[in-house]
């Protein structure tokens, strides 16, 4: 270590104390935010390495600065591992985030003002899939598709009909709050039928795709984007994949010099470490357990008539619950659960009647608790504790019982072993 913990604590006690408090919070809370996970110590070590000192504009073998031989090795490791994981011919590991990966993908496929179809935010889409407050909605003419109002599932006949009407240049598939399997082959059929390109944002399900537990979009999408955290269990960052050499060139130019300068090679190194972990057979077991734990929690809610799971269940790492029969809205539920050390987020549901700042639902994810070692029994217990909290929100004695139960679970499954 160049700068050890004792040096850090002595030099900047205020910052040290803040980080220590966050470590304590993560250890003592049950983390159910679907976009969060727990990285390995190896990932943290790589991200905190001396590579943070090095500027490296460009790409391996084509840098604008000298002294890049070593970071070329680092970045090439990340690229080759990403290609191996997803069976892609080309990979760009430099995006600082999933949103920037999406921005670069758009720049590679379409022009400002072009018509694009993306999933409606309330149906499970992401801000960068055309929300008016996002650069995507402000730069391109996005037309949203929604899930079926009855089944709350993707309706490919309706999406095809809509695509034939609006004639998009690009269709964006993928979601941040959709709990069922997505058939990317059908999206490609629709795109081909109307002469559009297909882009898939698999940020939430990338770890499941990597483990072979969700169909891969890579054979069907012209460009696939993802984050490297969430179910991939890596550092916070982005990744872009394609099988098209000409698109790969456009992607590289869109990232640098298009929207980014020097890559964060310490983060690229952390991505490389996490990709090595994904290639380990143990990762497939982890991903399978994520789905099992998600289903175990969902099953508890399905047995309670006061709660409704959107689309009737889950086939991945997350699910949405309509809580409005029990509490006023999703924000109230989120705040109540914060008080008992269970962390999740309020979330809009399809055809939402409340504002995004209140919402009718909550989103529950299993990636982080699975990384800590929770199994199906513990996952069912977590769901029971959520229900107990929301149904007894004014009973302090019951809430204290929940806090004690949460403490038992977090003490039994440490965030990190010493």
Swiss-Prot record:
Molecular function terms from GO: glycine hydroxymethyltransferase activity; pyridoxal phosphate binding
Annotated positions of the N6-(pyridoxal phosphate)lysine modification: 230
InterPro entries with a match to the protein in the record: PyrdxlP-dep_Trfase, PyrdxlP-dep_Trfase_major, PyrdxlP-dep_Trfase_small, Ser_HO-MeTrfase, Ser_HO-MeTrfase-like, Ser_HO-MeTrfase_PLP_BS, SHMT-like_dom
Cofactor requirement: pyridoxal 5'-phosphate
GO biological process terms, semicolon-separated: glycine biosynthetic process from serine; tetrahydrofolate interconversion
GO cellular component: cytosol
Residues carrying the site annotation Plays an important role in substrate specificity: 229
Subcellular location: Cytoplasm
Assigned keywords, A-Z: Amino-acid biosynthesis, Cytoplasm, One-carbon metabolism, Pyridoxal phosphate, Transferase
Catalytic activity: (6R)-5,10-methylene-5,6,7,8-tetrahydrofolate + glycine + H2O = (6S)-5,6,7,8-tetrahydrofolate + L-serine
Major localization listed first in the record, in broad terms: cytoplasm
Domain of life: Bacteria
Pathway annotation from the record: One-carbon metabolism; tetrahydrofolate interconversion; Amino-acid biosynthesis; glycine biosynthesis; glycine from L-serine: step 1/1
PANTHER family for this protein: SERINE HYDROXYMETHYLTRANSFERASE (PTHR11680), SERINE HYDROXYMETHYLTRANSFERASE 1 (PTHR11680:SF35)
Subunit structure: Homodimer.
Function: Catalyzes the reversible interconversion of serine and glycine with tetrahydrofolate (THF) serving as the one-carbon carrier. This reaction serves as the major source of one-carbon groups required for the biosynthesis of purines, thymidylate, methionine, and other important biomolecules. Also exhibits THF-independent aldolase activity toward beta-hydroxyamino acids, producing glycine and aldehydes, via a retro-aldol mechanism.
HAMAP family, per database record: SHMT (MF_00051)
Name of the featured protein: Serine hydroxymethyltransferase
Provenance organism: Streptococcus pneumoniae (strain CGSP14)
Name of the encoding gene: glyA
